[in-house]
Amino acid sequence: MKTLNIYHKIAALLSLTFLSLQSFAQQDPQFTQYMYNMSVINPAYATAEEGILNLGGLYRTQWVGLEGAPSTGTFFAHTPINDKIEMGISFTNDNIGDIVNENNIFADFAYVLPVGIETKISFGLKAGVRMFDTNFNGLQLQSGGTNTDIAFNENINRAFPNLGIGAFFFTDNYYLGVSAPNMLSTKHLENENGIKATGVENVHYFFTGGYVFDIDSKLKLKPAFMARSVKGAPLALDITANVLINEKLEAGLGYRLGDAMSALVNFRVTPDLRIGYAYDYTTNNLGDFNSGSHEIFILFDVDLFGFKNGYDRSPRFF
């Protein structure tokens, strides 16, 4: 692996990537194991498991070995209120080299409707706030200190409201989802310091789908995909294929179009607890400068009213 040993070049690159002097489209944080926390990207995600509180956390370190590379952590909670209403909350922190820091706090509301004997569709709303902060103190640009570029003269500390929408069609064996979790575009430095617009965050559109094939009584195949589109950025497409053994051990491979190949594994430690890990091997032009990306998650189900009594109730597999 090659190294970039001049920190100010890395910091300047990352800063300019996220705070270009021209408008640009900033991608939301990405996760290889998105299928285990879909409520973060789609407020309509529904579990249809009354009395069960789903808790989860996920942490990702991207491009390990590249100074100033992003790291992302998220926590989420989701539960049905009754057979038609489900609600959730999520918190996400995205940090880029201790220069750019974004915190998102959202609440989700989903309304579930039956459309057949085994099929349901839910419609969801997401509302919350994005808090965007920068720390340019001590940053060295290629042109010199921060006083050599008006865009970096002052730190930024701003909050932006956000609204999102989504739809989720599902059965026990497959799902399709479409969502726009950030409907309100934001401009982090609009008309400040003589700059027309810096750091534009545009609307992201997500389309997800997956199927659970029963190979035999102990083996299931779970292909899935996620497509993500945002103005000014190329289409992002994740394709994964997992196998589930004895409803406990799950492992799979994935590919992110033009970006990375991934391997993931998770284990159901108890009926209520699952832990997992994923590794991404970078295939784009940054691959020479990092050793890949790592991601861990934990999922925990809380039986609020003792409905499960220690046993599964026709468990869902997504």
Model-based region annotation:
Residues 1-2, 27:
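N-terminal hydrophobic targeting signals that begin at the initiator methionine
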Residues 2-12:
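Bacterial N-terminal signal peptides that target proteins for export
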Residues 26-318:
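Subset of outer-membrane beta-barrel
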Residues 21-25:
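Sec/Tat signal peptide C-region and signal peptidase I cleavage site
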